[in-house]
A protein has these predicted regions:
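N-terminal extracellular/periplasmic Venus flytrap/periplasmic-binding protein-like
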Residues: 15, 27, 31-36, 187-274
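Buried hydrophobic positions in well-ordered alpha/beta secondary-structure cores of metabolic enzymes
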Residues: 11, 47-50, 90, 97, ...
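Active-site-proximal alpha-helical scaffold in enzymes
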Residues: 84-114, 178-207, 263-271, 338
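Beta-strand segments within the central parallel beta-sheet cores of soluble alpha/beta enzyme folds
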Residues: 46-53, 79-84, 108-112, 187-194, ...
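Conserved active-site "lid/cap" helical segment
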Residues: 2-72, 76-79, 87, 169, ...
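Flexible glycine-/small-residue-enriched beta->alpha junction loops
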Residues: 108-176
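Conserved catalytic cysteine-centered active-site region
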Residues: 28, 54-107, 165-169, 227-256
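Active-site pocket-lining segment
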Residues: 57, 218, 285-338
Length: 338
């Protein structure tokens, strides 16, 4: 089956290397880090539409897609809009673009960017109102009040990456899920070790050479480590549950704060023909968007609900799929979901 009026294809794009938070790419913001990807992809073909996303809010723009496209000095007549859905933002961009194909839109560029090194500092509602009122009535007094702001007048929009509803981070939630599903520390470390080994092997054999755009500050991913070993992983202490004695998520089996940008193509058959010969592609047949009550079911457990529904709708089983790619924020998350 397919949910689309005609065949839809996803074709390989490009990305930056992924840098560690506070590391080589921390001087970028989400727009400037997106520009090299968008420019390089646009050199292959000009899309009919750009759909781009980012999660961490920025007060400097409201439409990262349009800002990126124009900063890349590309045609101002190409429309662009932004999406956001937490860690699924770029995937959501793909689904949104797929639903807009046809009627002259044959080739779309989709993707996203995140610079977790640079969450913007904002003012509290009280401080913001105080300054806004002063600027309207007495600009000189407002400047004085601005200089007199104290730490309690500021806040991070992400509040230390915590969920707004629960006040807990993804790691806090995942620690609870790992306990609930009895995902052991050993299983997590084993999965993390394999992930490091596979990523390093991919770089060594040149798999990423035509997928990653080297930047002046960073040429390859900073996170995969060739010297990761079972012993080194086992020696790490829990980072989210440090007190109970049963914490299992560590810096070794959890993904770090990361900076990067990535894009791909979503196209009709006619759109594919506009890409360079030999561009890898796959057909997008269907998709599923799911949500959970993260007070009781775990913040990162939506795939456990979405995957069975998607398979059932297409009369497939888990074993029928030859390759699964599941967002690996934590080793425990993948293990709990599958």
């Amino acid at each position: 089956m397919t949910r689309f009026a005609g065949p839809v294809f996803v074709a390989a794009g490009l990305r930056t290397p992924f840098g560690r938070g506070g590391g080589a790419l921390s001087a970028y913001d989400a727009v400037s880090l997106s520009v090299p990807v968008v420019k390089a992809m646009a050199a292959q073909a000009e899309p009919d539409l750009l759909v781009w996303g980012t999660v961490i809010p920025n007060m400097g723009w409201s439409n990262i897609a349009r800002e990126t496209w124009l900063d890349a000095k590309l045609s101002p007549t190409v429309p662009a809009f932004s999406v956001v859905l937490a860690c699924s933002t770029s995937m959501t961009a793909t689904f949104a673009a797929a639903g807009m194909l046809g009627g002259g839109t044959e080739l779309t560029m989709v993707g996203g960017s995140e610079v977790m090194s640079r969450p913007q500092i904002a003012l509290t509602a009280d401080a913001s109102k105080r300054l806004t009122d002063l600027f309207a009535s007495d600009p000189a007094a407002a400047l004085g009040a601005l200089q007199a702001l104290t730490p309690r007048d500021y806040l991070l929009p992400t509040k230390g990456w915590a969920n707004r509803i629960t006040g807990r981070t993804m790691g806090d939630h995942m620690e609870e899920t790992a306990k609930a599903w009895q995902v052991t520390r050993e299983a997590q470390d084993d999965w993390a070790l394999k992930s490091h080994q596979r990523a390093v092997a991919g770089w060594e054999r040149g798999f990423f050479d035509d997928l990653v755009i080297p930047l002046p500050e960073l040429a390859r991913d900073a996170n995969p480590s060739a010297d990761t070993s079972p012993e080194r992983l086992a020696a790490l202490k829990p980072v989210f549950d440090r007190d109970s004695g049963t914490g299992s998520l560590t810096a070794g089996n959890s993904s770090p704060i990361t900076d990067g940008a990535a894009g791909c193509w979503v196209a009709t058959k006619a759109g594919l023909a506009r890409l360079p010969t030999g561009t890898p592609y796959a057909r997008l047949v269907d998709y599923e968007v799911s949500a959970v009550d993260f007070h009781t079911e775990g913040l990162l457990m939506a795939p456990a609900y979405g995957i069975p529904r998607l398979l059932a709708r297409n009369r497939l089983s888990f074993a029928d799929i030859g390759l699964w790619e599941i967002h690996e924020a934590f080793a425990a998350q993948v293990l709990a979901n599958v």
